[in-house]
Amino acid sequence: MLNRCISRNTRLPVNLRIASRFYSDGPLGGAGPGNPQDIFIKRERAKEDYYARQQEREQLAHVKEQLKEHKKKLENLENKINNLSK
């Protein structure tokens, strides 16, 4: 009898429910390809890419302009050297 009382008191309650996480199919929910958040992300990414390309174009134009100026300076210096060597 004492053995039964001890074993009943030492048992821990067992919960048969198991916690589990459910993940969506995509990063913003599994609403599929028409998900408005997904469209927003694509639009933002396109705007950022456009901005980056514009910045690169401006930098490239600036570098090309500098290259033209340096070529002119180089040509002038070469002409001076040629005139002095004659």
From Swiss-Prot:
Principal location class: mitochondrion
Function: Endogenous low-affinity ATPase inhibitor, which inhibits specifically the reverse ATPase reaction of mitochondrial F(1)F(0)-type ATP synthase. Found to stabilize, together with STF2, a complex of intrinsic ATPase inhibitor INH1 and proton-translocating ATPase in mitochondrial membranes. Binds directly to purified F1-ATPase.
One Gene Ontology term of the molecular function aspect: ATPase inhibitor activity
Designated name of the protein: F(1)-ATPase inhibitor STF1, mitochondrial
Keyword Transit peptide: yes
Organism (species): Saccharomyces cerevisiae (strain ATCC 204508 / S288c)
Quaternary state and interactors: Monomer and homodimer. Monomeric at pH 5.0 and dimeric at either pH 6.5 or 8.0. The protein aggregates increasingly strongly with increasing pH.
Entry-linked Pfam families: IATP
Domain of life: Eukaryota
